[in-house]
Amino acid sequence: MANPLISNHHGKNGKYTQAFLEQNGPGDARPTALDILKDNDRIDSMKDKVFLLTGSSGGIGIETGRALAATGGKVYLGVRDLEKGKQALEEILEPGRVELLELDIGSMESVRTAAKTFLSKSTQLNVLVNNAGIMACSEAKTADGFESQLAINYLGHFLLYKLLEQTLLSSSTPEFQSRVVNVSSAGHHMSSVVLDNINLEGEYEEWKAYGNAKTACIWMTNEIEHRYGSKGLHGLSLMPGGIATGLQRHVDPETLKQWGSSEPAQKYGKSSAQGAATTITAAFGKEWEGKGGVYLEDCQEAGPVPEGGTLAVGVAPHAFDPEGEKKLWDLSLKMLDLSE
């Protein structure tokens, strides 16, 4: 019987096709973020570029930050707590080149302050990687009054992007067009965006809220592509894979036990370095130069859920909805009191 956790869309993957088809757990032959950089000749070759990452101090964020630093470019690593960030990222930090940026993505005030700080230090931004996130937590509101999963997974990132949008556009070059990379999740299958009740007032359920926010991440990058792709700014979203990180801290222990109990699930799991590989593909893959509006998994464009598969792989039909994407964009501007 085929492993239901293996995507059936590895025909275009070339070098790693077999590794993805023969999953064997964290640290197997599937590529790491640094492998992807090497494959794309990006090691120490981007010294004139600037990158910003959110959610840098835990899980795949650390490995994504490590890969960004390896490009040779200027890197800003967004962290909620500067002291914890310094401890987690100590071996990556390099004064004047790889720096921490205080950023609590769930606080719109913090996002505005961080964007202002960034712009005071840099007039350039080539890739924005929106990686910070939470998953399946109990219902809570942020200080701004937004549902917390929506605020942290999506709305804070939308605000950060909007505040840096003109810098991304002006930094785009013919040889490397600017990119916005949103780390979404297979959890987008759980729900489309609930446009008429986006904060899920009176209908909150933790997985529905997660799906609502993670589909919003996909819609955001699709709409960036629609609006700005022809101007040299591209949006890509992705599923990093199954990685054991602090992201799961709110998940019911029994659910976690079920997730990890089957052999296919154990083999499906990736290390954090492997989990960051798809993010780095979206950010630096030469096959995505000048392209966007796609959802990636396993370092390539995802196809639909394979027959007999599970919702852990593949992309849901509702992930591409041009009408919904425009409505979400307009709603987000209104919620954040922004104008175009």
Swiss-Prot record:
The keyword NADP applies. Keywords: NADP, Oxidoreductase. InterPro entries: NAD(P)-bd_dom_sf, SDR_fam. NADP(+) binds at residues 60, 84, 104, 131, 162, 210, 214. The keyword NADP applies. Pathway: Sesquiterpene biosynthesis. It comes from the Eukaryota. GO terms for molecular function: oxidoreductase activity. Its EC number is 1.1.99.-. Induction: Expression and the subsequent production of PR-toxin take place under static culture conditions (oxygen limited), whereas no expression of the PR-toxin genes occurs under the strongly aerated conditions required for optimal penicillin production. There is a negative control of the transcription of the PR-toxin genes by the penicillin biosynthesis gene product(s), or by a regulatory peptide encoded by a small ORF inside the penicillin gene cluster. The active site is at residues 184, 210, 214. It is an enzyme of class 1 (oxidoreductase). Signal peptide: none annotated. Belongs to the short-chain dehydrogenases/reductases (SDR) family. Short-chain dehydrogenase/reductase; part of the gene cluster that mediates the biosynthesis of PR-toxin, a bicyclic sesquiterpene belonging to the eremophilane class and acting as a mycotoxin. The first step of the pathway is catalyzed by the aristolochene synthase which performs the cyclization of trans,trans-farnesyl diphosphate (FPP) to the bicyclic sesquiterpene aristolochene. Following the formation of aristolochene, the non-oxygenated aristolochene is converted to the trioxygenated intermediate eremofortin B, via 7-epi-neopetasone. This is Short-chain dehydrogenase/reductase prx1.
